[in-house]
């Protein structure tokens, strides 16, 4: 799952994947993987606390993408999320930026995110 988080200026919060991970160095929308027994929404709330030190409400699902990379298949569920409380800061030593929608296409995102990015611009 991944969160589409916008600030009051309409910018999206993105984070950079750490070195040593699948697609290292690329930008992405914050999120992660579901643990057994979690709903997608519960997992996304947990991941956002773990990654960003803040709580968010999970809103509508915007898109689901299934993408086949040479080494694995991923299914991504993108949700609109709204900040609730805390201080947004990256806890997993990753870079974080607020980016205008028009700039998203200029940055290096995983191929699975491209269709969504085209919709957000």
Predicted segments, located by residue:
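Short hydrophobic/aromatic beta-strand or adjacent loop that forms the aromatic wall/cage
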Residues: 2, 74-78, 113
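Hydrophobic packing within well-folded, soluble alpha/beta domains
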Residues: 3, 14, 43-48, 61, ...
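Conserved N-terminal beta-strand and adjoining loop/helix that marks the start
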Residues: 1-12, 33
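Charged phosphate-binding loop/patch that engages nucleotide di/tri-phosphates or the phosphate backbone
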Residues: 112-121
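Active-site-adjacent beta-strand/loop module that shapes the phosphate/pyrophosphate-binding cleft
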Residues: 7, 55-57, 64-88, 95-97, ...
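A conserved beta-turn-beta hairpin within the catalytic core of GNAT-like acetyltransferases
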Residues: 22-26
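The catalytic Nudix box helix
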Residues: 29-61, 100
């Amino acid at each position: 799952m991944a969160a589409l988080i916008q600030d009051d200026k309409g910018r999206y919060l993105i984070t950079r994947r750490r070195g040593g991970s699948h697609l290292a160095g690329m930008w992405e929308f914050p999120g992660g993987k579901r643990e057994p027994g979690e709903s997608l929404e519960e997992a996304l709330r947990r991941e956002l606390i773990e990654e960003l030190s803040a709580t968010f409400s999970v809103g509508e699902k915007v898109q689901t993408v299934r993408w086949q990379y040479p080494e694995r298949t991923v299914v991504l569920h993108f949700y609109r999320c709204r900040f609730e409380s805390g201080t947004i800061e990256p806890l997993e030593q990753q870079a974080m930026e607020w980016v205008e929608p028009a700039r998203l296409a200029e940055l290096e995102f995983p191929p699975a995110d491209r269709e969504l990015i085209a919709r957000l611009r």
